[in-house]
Regions:
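Gly/Pro-rich hinge or "lid" segments in bacterial periplasmic/extracellular proteins
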Residues: 8-12, 19-21, 30, 37, ...
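Extracytoplasmic/peripheral linker and loop segments enriched in polar/acidic and small residues
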Residues: 18-28, 160, 261-274, 301-368, ...
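Alpha-helical secondary-structure segments
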Residues: 30-34, 80, 109-111, 129, ...
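Alpha-to-beta junction loops
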Residues: 31-33, 123, 128-137, 254, ...
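Extracellular/periplasmic solute-recognition and catalytic clefts
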Residues: 84-94, 111-149, 173-174, 182
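Ligand/substrate-recognition segments at binding pockets and active sites
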Residues: 88, 212, 218-292, 363
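Structural transition elements
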Residues: 181-221, 242-245
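Long beta-strand-rich cores associated with HINT superfamily self-processing modules
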Residues: 365-392
């Protein structure tokens, strides 16, 4: 993120070319922080509201050391609330009003209880019983098809076959029919618009389709090219995602039905373990989700550049990299031209079938009618309690 913000020397420091952190384009004097950029970055204002760019109190960070941020007690706060009773893993804790917050006089709520409820049905029942005021009914991730250590996944025709054998409408209906929609491109709908008002998601959509006959033909040809008569793949997904099991079951069923010779196994691990497996390329196919950090295309297209830390499948394309770089540099101040660059990048992903967009996650929630001022965002911080309150 520091590199994509055009922060001076961030890329060279991350790569190790520069060791002196004082050369990073950030200086602090008193209560003023100054950032020096190498080129225009329209989305930089969004970065400044993101936690990665929040200044930390050096003396406290050094005092706490490796325990910094691991529990509510090992953290200091500058926002509207303090976190209480969080031990690093428990699913229920409190947000307590911070009297030192700069706008505390307008924060009406003294405390907020946050509780993790894994089962949607349980959340609904608790809502009906008055135990909670707001419930998100579903949450899941999008399937992400990548090259791994399996030889067959280095074959373009096999990857294309998997994409063509993915019934996106069926997955949504079977697993996440709570406001989610079938994916058409990498960026979700309503993330950003072109100057003419067209949705970026629709504009960049390269034409993903569900075509089992074409998928079967390509799969057969691909197997012949790699010298195999059959293929076994494992799909890795989050064990703590309420919809992941249904999604994986549906994909397994449709893939095996459409592609004779394919056997799909399921592997469910914790969210933390899934991240580790993805980072270490310990997967064949992994369900992977991403929420945008800000309302602009680079928050998604930055994922698949050759050197991106989130490019778990090690996809590499000069065409993709060049298009992305052009969008965030030369065309950064020209939204229409940047959209064309993103469309070029999307086509590179589509042509090589290095990933498989399945659905855009949408959430429906139950909210107490007495709860006012609660803000929900589509990017960045999902829920903002700053000015939320309950009426009598």
């Amino acid at each position: 993120m520091a590199t994509e913000s055009h922060l001076l020397n961030a890329d060279k420091i991350n790569s190790g070319d520069i060791k002196d952190l004082n050369k990073l384009g950030v200086t602090a004097k008193g209560n003023q922080v100054t950032f020096k950029l190498t080129s225009p970055c329209p989305q930089f204002k969004y970065y400044l509201a993101f936690s990665n760019f929040m200044p930390q109190k050096q003396s406290y960070v050094e005092k706490v050391g490796k325990d910094y941020g691991t529990t509510s007690k090992n953290q200091i706060y500058s926002g509207p609330y303090l976190v209480k009773d969080w031990n690093g893993s428990n699913g229920k804790f409190k947000l307590v009003k911070n009297k030192y917050y700069w706008d505390s006089k307008h924060v009406k709520t003294n405390s907020v209880i946050v509780q993790t409820i894994k089962k949607p049905d349980t959340a609904v029942q608790m809502y009906k019983q008055g135990q909670i005021d707001f419930a998100e009914i579903s949450g899941t991730s999008a399937i992400y098809n990548q090259t791994g250590s399996v030889k067959a996944l280095t074959n373009q025709k096999i990857r294309q076959a998997l994409n063509l054998a993915t019934d996106r409408k069926g997955v949504v209906k079977a697993a996440v029919d709570t406001g989610s929609t079938p994916a058409e491109s990498l960026v979700p709908k309503k993330l950003a618009k072109l100057p003419n008002g067209e949705d970026l998601s629709k504009y960049t959509a390269p034409g993903y389709t569900y075509n089992t006959s074409k998928a079967q033909k390509l799969f057969k040809e691909g197997l012949a090219e790699v010298g195999q008569s059959s293929l076994k793949l494992t799909i890795t997904a989050d064990s703590d995602s309420p919809a992941a099991k249904n999604a994986v079951d549906y994909v397994k069923s449709t893939w095996e039905s459409a592609l004779p010779g394919l056997t799909v196994e399921e592997k469910f691990v914790t969210f933390k373990q899934r991240l580790e497996d993805a980072k270490n390329e310990n997967f064949d196919v992994v369900l992977f989700s991403w929420g945008g950090d800000y309302p602009e295309g680079s928050t998604f297209y930055g994922l698949f550049t050759t050197n991106s830390a989130y490019n778990y499948g090690k996809f590499s394309s000069k065409e993709y990299d060049n298009a992305y770089q052009k969008a965030i540099t030369t065309d950064a101040l020209k939204p229409g031209d940047a959209a064309n660059d993103y469309k070029t990048a999307e086509k590179a992903l589509f042509d090589q079938s290095y990933y498989n967009p399945v659905y855009y996650l949408g959430k429906k929630g139950l909210q107490n009618s007495k709860l006012k001022g609660l803000v929900r965002n589509s990017t960045g911080l999902n829920v903002d309690f700053t000015y939320a309150y309950k009426t009598e």
